[in-house]
């Protein structure tokens, strides 16, 4: 089924369809850009023209190359014109029934050797291909927005997809300057599945009134190295879009609790507070937001303090124990240890987050803050919360990545590549897990599961296996 792809058809002239068309045309392909609306096609091509002209102005592209690229774009409103395509990339409605009907029509219009692909972010490739002729030529080709900029493409195989089709799509997207990753058709594929905890744990913290949205975002962004905080990111994506993907994955996994949608996010969607595009979401985008600056400097003088670093993430500051989070509350630790306890959530960067036991004397908590500020840290304080913000979120992402790996969704390398390039995580989750330590991640999730009594935090069996191997190597 290997064919020479010269003509590419793109179905849908919205943001994603236009972006994919621009990519294909920029790499020498004649592109048939299809939409039922001639006006939408005009807007799409005008937008591509404007983007290419901007690159010419900035010296990134020659005027001649710009002109040649635009000449390769052919707007079409008759689906029968797509019979000339070697590859079709559908980027239209994210509804299964619409896609099934469209692909059935494409299977009749296009020759048997034409590769039929969909840019869906989460819909089953197997379901789309199930009732059409030659289902072995159907695959997922999931670009990320904006398509001309983002490197990642998920190449998704359904149950019937031929191996040579996947191979050819990987080679083609590589020639377009993209980084393909291979995965099997499961809900959310790689990125939209493994990324769900980044959003869901932020919503849970907001629901439990652990901290203000800007503190939650600052902790993950400035304390763990994520490019954006989870709540501001949902505002940028669009609350309706992000919520719909979460609901899709949740229902596709038979209401698996790890993917439980948020009632707070649902309220925003119902209320039309969709984020940046509507002006209101988690944040008010009509007004300038103030930066999170951390706690005020503690003016008390606690010097000289006796500081002793114990094993396993414990620092003793006079009578106060500063303990790196392992999934227990500060209150539980303080009562068990009969000492003032401040739990710290830190991973990378200057920002650290703390939570203090309610039984602590105020001076004990202030002493811990003073110590951290003297180390040059920006300190954020949240309510006493097991697993805190950073470690809980990262542990859940790693657990989900391990579950996807164990179930054969994709290779370890492709999962890590997908999360680094698709959502710009500072590390691939599986490499991150090895760096942080499997035993600590397992212990944290077990403590969370015990605290909540929920299956949401159950560690996957591959995490248990890796933690066991790690303990064996260390003994």
UniProtKB/Swiss-Prot annotation:
Keyword annotations from UniProtKB, A to Z: NAD, Oxidoreductase
Phenotype when the gene is knocked out: Mutants accumulate 3-hydroxyadipate and are unable to use phenylacetate as a carbon source.
Top-level taxonomic group: Bacteria
Name this polypeptide is given: 3-hydroxyadipyl-CoA dehydrogenase
Induction, as annotated: Activated by cAMP receptor protein (CRP), integration host factor (IHF) and by phenylacetyl-coenzyme A (PA-CoA) that prevents PaaX from binding its target sequences. Inhibited by PaaX.
GO aspect biological process, one term: phenylacetate catabolic process
This enzyme's EC code(s): 1.1.1.-
GO MF annotation, one: 3-hydroxybutyryl-CoA dehydrogenase activity
Role of this protein: Catalyzes the oxidation of 3-hydroxyadipyl-CoA to yield 3-oxoadipyl-CoA.
Catalytic activity: (3S)-3-hydroxyadipyl-CoA + NAD(+) = 3-oxoadipyl-CoA + NADH + H(+)
Quaternary organization: Homotrimer.
Recorded metabolic or biological pathway in which this protein acts: Aromatic compound metabolism; phenylacetate degradation
């Amino acid at each position: 089924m290997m064919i020479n792809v010269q003509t590419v058809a793109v179905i849908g002239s919205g943001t994603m369809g236009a972006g994919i068309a621009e990519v294909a045309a920029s790499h020498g392909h004649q592109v048939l850009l299809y939409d039922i609306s001639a006006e939408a096609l005009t807007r799409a091509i005008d937008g591509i023209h404007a983007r290419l002209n901007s690159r010419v102005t900035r010296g990134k592209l020659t005027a001649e190359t710009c002109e040649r690229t635009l000449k390769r774009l052919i707007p079409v409103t008759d689906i029968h014109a797509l019979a000339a395509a070697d590859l079709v990339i559908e980027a239209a409605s994210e509804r299964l029934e619409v896609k099934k009907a469209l692909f059935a029509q494409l299977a009749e219009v296009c020759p048997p050797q034409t590769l039929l692909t969909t840019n869906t972010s989460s819909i089953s490739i197997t379901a789309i291909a199930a009732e059409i002729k030659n289902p072995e030529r159907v695959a997922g080709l999931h670009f990320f927005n904006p398509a001309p900029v983002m490197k990642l493409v998920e190449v998704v195989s359904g149950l019937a997809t031929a191996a040579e089709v996947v191979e050819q799509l990987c080679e083609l997207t590589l020639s377009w300057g993209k980084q393909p990753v291979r995965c099997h058709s499961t809900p959310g594929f790689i990125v939209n599945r493994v990324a769900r905890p980044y959003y869901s744990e932020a919503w849970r913290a907001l629901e439990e009134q652990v901290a203000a949205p800007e503190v939650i975002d600052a902790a993950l962004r400035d304390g763990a190295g994520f490019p954006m905080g989870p709540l501001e990111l949902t505002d940028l994506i669009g609350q309706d879009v992000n919520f719909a993907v979460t609901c899709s994955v949740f229902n596709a996994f038979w209401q698996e609790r790890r993917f439980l949608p948020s009632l707070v996010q649902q309220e925003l969607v119902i209320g039309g507070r969709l984020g940046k595009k509507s002006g209101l979401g988690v944040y008010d985008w009509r007004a300038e937001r103030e930066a999170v600056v951390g706690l005020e400097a503690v003016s008390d003088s606690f010097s000289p303090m006796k500081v002793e670093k114990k094993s396993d993430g414990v620092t003793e500051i006079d009578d106060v124990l500063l303990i790196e989070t392992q999934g227990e509350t500060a209150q539980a630790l303080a009562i068990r240890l009969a000492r003032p306890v401040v739990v710290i959530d830190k991973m990378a960067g200057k920002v650290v987050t703390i939570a203090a036991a309610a039984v602590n004397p105020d001076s004990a908590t202030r002493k811990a803050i003073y110590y951290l500020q003297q180390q040059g840290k920006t300190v954020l304080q949240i309510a006493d919360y097991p697993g805190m913000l950073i470690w809980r979120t990262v542990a859940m992402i790693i657990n989900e990545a391990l579950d996807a790996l164990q179930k054969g969704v994709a290779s370890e390398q492709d999962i890590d590549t997908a999360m680094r390039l698709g959502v710009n995580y500072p590390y691939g989750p599986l490499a991150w897990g090895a760096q942080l330590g499997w035993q600590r991640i397992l212990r944290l999730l077990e403590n969370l599961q015990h605290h909540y009594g929920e299956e949401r935090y159950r560690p996957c069996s591959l995490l248990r296996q890796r933690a066991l191997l790690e303990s064996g190597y260390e003994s």
